[in-house]
Design a protein with these regions (language model features):
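A short, proline-enriched helix->beta-strand linker immediately N-terminal to the Walker B motif
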Residues: 30-34
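Conserved ABC ATPase "signature" region
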Residues: 1-7
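Hydrophobic anchor residue at the start of the ABC signature
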Residues: 25
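Conserved ABC ATPase signature
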Residues: 11-15, 19-21
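Conserved catalytic loops of ABC-family nucleotide-binding domains
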Residues: 56-70
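Catalytic Walker B motif of ABC-type/P-loop ATPase nucleotide-binding domains
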Residues: 36-39
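Conserved beta-strand-loop-alpha-helix hinge in the C-terminal portion
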Residues: 91-115
Length: 120
């Protein structure tokens, strides 16, 4: 799923940042955790790999009831979540929940980010 099988036998200096990140995600999931803490899980990934990771997180949440707490600055990655807390200056600025459409949720995220960025 994460495309890391071909990395078997490679040394750490032989893998890219994205390959290392996908390997770290696999390592975090190997023991079937009930909670997953993800700090910028798509930060070093291309858009295709980011989509694979976020769809995997959605799948394990739905099928295995794995709660994922994720920190991200990526609105597209955030749109895969069911609930988002926006933090500004160490305090909760806003909170939104996903309805039926991820695309609509993405637009809501962008709207909040526009407001958040305008409060200087």
């Amino acid at each position: 799923i994460l495309g890391i099988k071909d990395l078997l036998g490679k040394r750490t200096f032989e893998v890219s940042g994205g390959q290392a990140q996908r390997t770290a995600i696999a390592r975090a999931l190997i023991n079937n955790p009930s909670i997953l803490l993800a700090d910028e899980p798509t930060g070093n990934l291309d858009s295709k790999s980011s989509k694979v990771v976020m769809e995997l997180f959605q799948k394990i949440n739905k099928e295995n009831k794995v709660t994922t707490m994720m920190v991200t600055h990526d609105p597209l990655a955030a749109s895969y979540c069911s609930r988002i807390l926006f933090i500004k200056d160490g305090s909760i600025y806003n909170e939104i929940y996903k309805g039926s459409s991820r695309e609509q949720f993405y637009q809501e995220i962008m709207d909040v980010l526009t407001l958040l960025g305008g409060d200087n």
